[in-house]
């Protein structure tokens, strides 16, 4: 269990509780979770973070009414900046989006502006929103993470409790390498409900070579770890930076969707540009 799982800042969340679904617009349904909850225990300070990045959300179940009452549908792309005070809690995001279903808007841009305003207010940070018509995305190929997959290793896992022990002495030699490693075995659990969160992760770095077996064991140790997606990515970045001390590091995870939403956080200390094409499990 995370050290802050019972923090009072989480007590008011609708997550894990029975809730009524509203189909008329209500911005108050959105709920934020302070990023400081997991950053403070990691020693990360808002004014001196070792990374930049965004939380990329894809909205697959977005619908509203036009001015004449005709339903509209779109796929939304949201980017929430890492400097925001709060992350957006996903169940509240889903409930908020449902509140658009029977609400009339004059045009698509009004919907986009409403989303940007409300999400920015909840997160207390910078948010950008793009809406796509379905025909704009038809035929879009399934993407993949570039890099070397480290999953096919003949190893025995006898401990799947989270630990950073595997990263101790995980680098060898003085030779500097630059490589991209990928795993599809990332699985953590929701901080509140403990429901499973499934993801793929891409790690780009420049530095002393990281032992792939130790890295895989570390990633697998998240299997019973309870944190939100964004928190897990920041923990992984921080742990790799602390124990492996790469010159450059980027960590990007794309999680499978739940409730019509997928969350894809990335953190980097260099000029990393993430691919936003959905992966095969998304």
Curated annotation (Swiss-Prot):
User: GO molecular function of the protein, one example?
Assistant: preQ1 synthase activity
Gene Ontology cellular component annotations, sorted alphabetically: cytoplasm
Residues of the active site:
190, 197
What UniProt keywords apply to this chain's record, in alphabetical order?
Answer: Cytoplasm, NADP, Oxidoreductase, Queuosine biosynthesis
Quote the catalytic activity from the record.
7-aminomethyl-7-carbaguanine + 2 NADP(+) = 7-cyano-7-deazaguanine + 2 NADPH + 3 H(+)
By its UniProt entry, which Gene3D superfamilies does this protein fall under?
A: 3.30.1130.10
Specify the enzyme's EC class, one word: oxidoreductase
Biological pathway: tRNA modification; tRNA-queuosine biosynthesis
Q: Does the keyword Electron transport apply?
A: no
Regions that span the bilayer: none
Q: Where in the cell is it found?
A: Cytoplasm
| Keyword RNA-binding recorded | no
Please give the Pfam families that the UniProt record associates with this protein.
Answer: QueF, QueF_N
EC number, as in UniProt: 1.7.1.13
List, in alphabetical order, the GO biological process terms annotated in this UniProt record.
queuosine biosynthetic process; tRNA modification
SUPFAM superfamilies given in the database record: Tetrahydrobiopterin biosynthesis enzymes-like
Describe the family membership recorded for this protein in Swiss-Prot or TrEMBL.
Belongs to the GTP cyclohydrolase I family. QueF type 2 subfamily.
- What does the UniProt record say this protein does? Catalyzes the NADPH-dependent reduction of 7-cyano-7-deazaguanine (preQ0) to 7-aminomethyl-7-deazaguanine (preQ1).
Q: What is this protein called?
A: NADPH-dependent 7-cyano-7-deazaguanine reductase
Species of provenance: Escherichia coli O127:H6 (strain E2348/69 / EPEC)
């Amino acid at each position: 269990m995370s050290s802050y799982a019972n923090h009072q800042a989480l007590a008011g969340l609708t997550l894990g509780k029975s809730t009524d679904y509203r189909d008329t617009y209500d911005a108050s349904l959105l709920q934020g979770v302070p990023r400081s909850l997991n950053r403070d225990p990691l020693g990360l300070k808002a004014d001196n973070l070792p990374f930049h990045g965004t939380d990329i959300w894809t909205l697959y179940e977005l619908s509203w009414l036009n001015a004449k009452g005709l339903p509209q549908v779109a796929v939304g792309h949201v980017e929430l900046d890492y400097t925001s005070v709060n992350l957006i809690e996903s169940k509240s995001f889903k409930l908020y989006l449902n509140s658009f279903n029977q609400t009339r808007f004059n045009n698509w841009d009004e919907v986009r502006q409403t989303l940007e305003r409300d999400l920015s207010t909840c997160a207390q940070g910078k948010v950008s929103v793009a809406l796509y018509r379905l025909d704009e995305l038809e035929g879009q190929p399934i993407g993949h993470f570039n890099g070397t997959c480290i999953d096919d290793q003949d190893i025995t896992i006898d401990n799947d409790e989270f630990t950073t022990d595997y990263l101790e002495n995980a680098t060898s030699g003085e030779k500097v390498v630059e490589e991209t490693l990928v795993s599809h075995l990332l699985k953590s659990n929701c901080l509140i409900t403990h429901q499973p969160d499934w993801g793929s992760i891409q790690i780009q770095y420049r530095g002393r070579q990281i032992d792939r077996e130790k890295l895989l064991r570390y990633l697998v140790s998240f299997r019973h770890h309870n944190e939100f997606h964004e928190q897990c990515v920041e923990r992984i970045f921080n742990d790799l930076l602390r124990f492996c001390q790469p010159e450059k590091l980027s960590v990007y995870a794309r999680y499978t969707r739940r409730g019509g939403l997928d969350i894809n956080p990335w953190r980097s200390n260099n000029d990393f540009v993430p691919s936003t094409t959905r992966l095969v499990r998304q």
